[in-house]
Swiss-Prot record:
Transmembrane helix as UniProt keyword: yes
Function: May play a role in intracellular immune modulation by activating NF-kappaB response and attenuating Toll-like-receptor response.
Main location: Golgi
Keyword line: Glycoprotein, Golgi apparatus, Membrane, Signal, Transmembrane, Transmembrane helix
Signal peptide: 1-34
Primary gene name: Gpr108
Keyword Mitochondrion: no
Cellular component terms per the entry's GO annotation: cis-Golgi network membrane; Golgi apparatus; Golgi membrane; membrane; trans-Golgi network
Name of the featured protein: Protein GPR108
Glycosylated residues, chain numbering: N59, N111, N233, N237
TM region positions: 296-316, 325-345, 369-389, 400-420, 434-454, 482-502, 506-526
Organism (species): Rattus norvegicus (Rat)
Entry-linked PANTHER family: LUNG SEVEN TRANSMEMBRANE RECEPTOR, PROTEIN GPR108
Ranges for region Disordered: 144-224
Length: 577
C-alpha cells in the first residue's frame, strides 16, 4: 500500500472543519512533486504496477532510480529473473498494454515483437539484464543524467571502430562526456566482504552498483546491456536513463513494474519499493500533450473573465429585471476564470521546475472545488425555476440538491487525490473510478429539475388560461434541456473519444474541447436567461392582458364578433377581430 497520512474531520466545529480541510489539501500536496515522481510502496502485493505514462519528443529523457527494493527470501533464491521493469510505447489514450493478458502470465518471460524494453532484475547474480524488442534506437545508459550537461555536440566515434546495430546501447550525443564522467566515478575498488561478483559488476562502499559496457558475442553481434545491481543490507538498488534518439521513437511511453511471483492468487508475497522517476522533454518537464496547456488555460481564463465582465455590465443596465441567480451566474464565471489562471500557473512551474508551487496548487484546488459546486448548483437552480418565478424549492428539488452538493465535494476530493498521488499508488485507480462514477451521477441528477419544470409547464399550459406565456417558457426550457444534454455529451463522451483518436502530441485538444464547450454553454445560458423585458422566462401575465383574454373568449362564445374591433395596446392602428 502507498505511504499516506489521514486526518479525521468529525467532531469539529464548522470553522475547525474548514481549516482541517485546507490542511488536508496541503498534506495531500506535500507528496506531489509534479513530473519528478517519487513513489514509496510498503507491503505491496500487486503483480503489475503502472508507474507512469509520458509523451516524449526527440532528445527527451527518462531517468529511473530504484533506491530500495526489498523482496522475500523465497523470491531472492530464484535464478530466473521474475522481477523487473518494462518500458513500452502505447497508443494514446489506451489502457496499459498488459491489462488484457492472462493474469497468470508473466510479461517478463515472453518475447514480443512490439516496441518494448525489459529490465530483468537478477537477484542471484546481482545484475540487471536489458532486453530490447522491435526496431528502436533508444539510448540506454546506467546511472542518472547530470543536472547540467557539460557539453553538447555530435557523438564521439567508437574507439574500437566496430560498426553498431540496433542492439548497441550508447549514451545520448548531448550527454556523452557527462555519462562517461559518471561511469568513471563508479570505478571504485571492491570493498572486502562483498559477495563475489562476475567481472564488470563491482560495488562501491555505499552499495551502489557498477555496470559493464556491452560486449560482443562469438557471432560478432552485440550482447544485451547488463547493469550492476547494488546490494545494501537486505535491499537492492540500481538506476538508468533513456534518451529518445530520433523522431521514429517519439510517442507515448508507459513504464511498469512487474513482480511475477505475485501472479498466482493466494500466494502473493509483500515487497517494498521506492523509486524516483524523472521525465523531461527538450522544452521542459511537461509531457508532449501538456506543453500547450499553459497557454491554453491562460487564454481560456481571459475569455471567461471577459464573459464575466460583460455579464456584470448587462446586469447593471437591467437592474429591475435582475434576480439572485443572475449574480450567482456572474460568480461562476469569475470563479472559473480564477481556477483556470491558477491551473495555468501550475503548469508553468511544473514545466520549468518539475514540480508546482504548493501554495498556488492549493489555491487552484480550492477554486476548482468552488467552481464545480457553483456549476451544478446554478444549472439545477435555473432548471427548477428558482428566483425567477418562485422562491421556494419543492421537496423533490431539495433532495436533488442534497445529493448533488455532497457528491460534488466527493468528486473534487477524488480530483485532488488523483492530481496529487502517483499513478503507481495502490488507491490511485480506485479514486479515478470514484471520480468517473460521481461525475456521471451528478450529470444525470441535474437533468431532473429541468424535466420536472417542463412537465409542470405542460400541465399548466392547458389549465390556467395563460397559454401564450407558458408555451413560451416551455419552449425555453426545452432549449435549455437540449443545451445541458449537449454540454454533458461534448465534455464527457466526445472529449473521451477525441482523446483516444488523436495522436499523443495532440492530446491537448481534449482540454480545448472541454473548455470551449463550457464557455459556449455559459454564453448560451446567459443569452437565454438574460435579465431583459422580452425574456419569456421573466414574463408574468399582466392583469389587463388577462382581462383581454377573458373578454375575447366571452365575445367568441356569444357570437358578437361582427363589426367589432379591438385596440392593440402594443402597436399603432386597429386590429380586426
Amino acid at each position: 500500500m502507498a505511504v499516506s497520512e489521514r486526518r479525521g474531520l468529525s467532531g469539529e466545529s464548522p470553522a475547525q472543519c474548514r481549516w482541517e480541510y485546507l490542511s488536508l489539501l496541503v498534506l495531500m500536496l506535500s507528496g506531489c512533486s509534479g513530473r519528478i515522481h517519487r513513489l514509496t510502496l510498503t507491503g505491496e502485493k500487486r503483480a503489475d504496477i503502472q508507474l507512469n505514462s509520458f509523451g516524449f519528443y526527440t532528445n527527451g529523457s527518462l531517468e529511473v532510480e530504484l533506491s530500495l527494493l526489498r523482496l522475500s527470501l523465497q523470491e531472492t533464491e530464484d535464478k530466473f529473473p521474475k522481477v523487473g521493469f518494462s518500458l513500452s510505447r502505447v497508443r494514446s489514450g489506451s489502457v496499459r498494454s498488459y491489462s488484457s493478458r492472462n493474469s497468470h502470465e508473466c510479461p517478463l518471460e515472453r518475447n514480443s515483437s512490439n516496441f518494448l524494453v525489459l529490465f530483468l532484475i537478477n537477484i542471484k547474480d546481482l545484475q540487471v539484464q536489458v532486453r530490447k524488442y522491435g526496431e528502436q534506437k533508444l539510448f540506454i545508459s546506467p546511472g542518472l543524467l547530470p543536472e547540467a550537461p557539460s557539453q553538447s555536440g555530435p557523438p564521439k566515434p567508437d574507439p574500437t571502430g566496430t560498426p553498431k546495430d540496433n542492439h548497441v546501447i550508447h549514451p545520448s550525443p548531448k550527454k556523452m562526456s557527462a555519462v562517461k564522467e559518471d561511469q568513471a566515478k563508479l570505478t571504485v575498488p571492491q570493498v572486502s566482504g562483498d559477495k563475489a561478483l562476475p567481472a564488470g559488476h563491482r560495488h562501491s562502499s555505499d552499495g551502489q552498483p557498477q555496470s559493464q559496457p556491452p560486449t560482443r558475442g562469438p557471432s560478432g553481434k552485440e550482447k544485451d546491456l547488463v547493469l550492476g545491481l547494488g546490494h545494501l543490507n537486505d535491499s537492492y538498488n540500481f538506476s538508468f536513463h533513456i534518451v529518445i534518439g530520433s523522431r521514429a521513437e517519439e510517442g507515448q511511453y508507459s513504464l511498469n513494474f512487474h513482480n511475477c511471483y505475485n501472479t498466482i492468487p493466494g500466494q502473493e508475497q509483500p515487497f517494498d519499493l521506492t523509486v524516483m522517476i524523472r521525465e523531461k522533454n527538450p522544452e521542459g518537464f511537461l509531457s508532449a500533450a501538456e506543453i500547450p496547456l499553459f497557454k491554453l488555460y491562460l487564454i481560456m481564463s481571459a475569455c471567461f473573465l471577459a464573459a464575466g465582465i460583460f455579464w456584470v455590465s448587462v446586469l447593471c443596465k437591467n437592474t429591475y429585471s435582475v434576480f439572485k441567480i443572475h449574480w450567482l451566474m456572474a460568480a461562476l464565471a469569475f470563479t472559473k476564470s480564477v481556477s483556470l489562471l491558477f491551473h495555468s500557473i501550475n503548469y508553468y512551474f511544473i514545466n520549468s521546475q518539475g514540480h508546482p508551487i504548493e501554495g498556488l496548487a492549493v489555491m487552484h484546488y480550492i477554486t476548482h472545488l468552488l467552481k464545480g459546486a457553483l456549476l451544478f448548483i446554478t444549472i439545477a437552480l435555473i432548471g427548477s425555476g428558482w428566483a425567477f418565478v418562485k422562491y421556494m424549492l419543492s421537496d423533490k428539488e431539495k433532495k436533488i440538491f442534497g445529493i448533488v452538493i455532497p457528491l460534488q465535494v466527493l468528486a473534487n476530493v477524488a480530483y485532488i487525490v488523483i492530481e496529487s498521488r502517483e499513478e503507481g499508488a495502490s488507491d490511485y485507480g480506485l479514486w479515478k473510478e470514484i471520480l468517473f462514477l460521481v461525475d456521471l451521477i451528478c450529470c444525470g441528477a441535474i437533468l431532473f429539475p429541468v424535466v420536472w419544470s417542463i412537465r409542470h409547464l405542460q400541465d399548466a399550459s392547458g389549465t390556467d388560461g395563460k397559454v401564450a406565456v407558458n408555451l413560451a417558457k416551455l419552449k425555453l426550457f426545452r432549449h435549455y434541456y437540449v443545451m445541458v444534454i449537449c454540454y454533458i455529451y461534448f465534455t464527457r463522451i466526445i472529449a473521451i473519444l477525441l482523446r483516444v483518436a488523436v495522436p499523443f502530441q495532440w492530446q491537448w485538444l481534449y482540454q480545448l474541447l472541454v473548455e470551449s464547450s463550457t464557455l459556449a454553454f455559459f454564453v448560451l445560458t446567459g443569452y437565454k436567461f438574460q435579465p431583459a423585458g422580452d425574456n419569456p422566462y421573466l414574463q408574468l401575465p399582466q392583469q389587463e392582458d388577462e382581462e383581454d383574454v377573458q373578454m375575447e373568449q366571452v365575445m367568441t362564445d356569444s357570437g358578437f364578433r361582427e363589426g367589432l374591433s379591438k385596440v392593440n395596446k402594443t402597436a399603432s392602428g386597429r386590429e380586426l377581430l
